Amino acid sequence: LKTFPNIKIVLDHAGNPDFRTKAYFENWKKGMTKISKIENIICKISGLGMGDHHWTKDSILPYVETCMNLFGISRTIFATNWPVDSLYSNYSKVINTYIEITKDLSEDEKDAFFFKNAEEIYGI
């Protein structure tokens, strides 16, 4: 990946964390820290219900915050994972949870996270 710095790689589902234990989180964070050092990797935060079928804001918050802190707002993208997410939640719960998680970000940071980064990376 470092050999081709102009190719943008999107890491899907925040690296797909499967479990919500402290040991798993620490191991996941260690891997994400290594990945985040590669500047052409963008982290798409989506589908966290796949590893946590009864997820809450509090259960996903450490994963979301870690991604945002490691990759920075400029290299994170919000996404849903429909229709798979519908197995574990509903659309308004997902959207409202992420709105709550990002409430302290500036308007520019929210715009970047929720749509501007995706527009740039996907060329839409």
Outline where the language-model segments fall.
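Divalent metal-coordination and catalytic microenvironments
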Residues: 13, 43, 81, 110, ...
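Mid-to-C-terminal alpha-helical segments outside catalytic/metal-binding sites
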Residues: 66, 70-77, 86-124
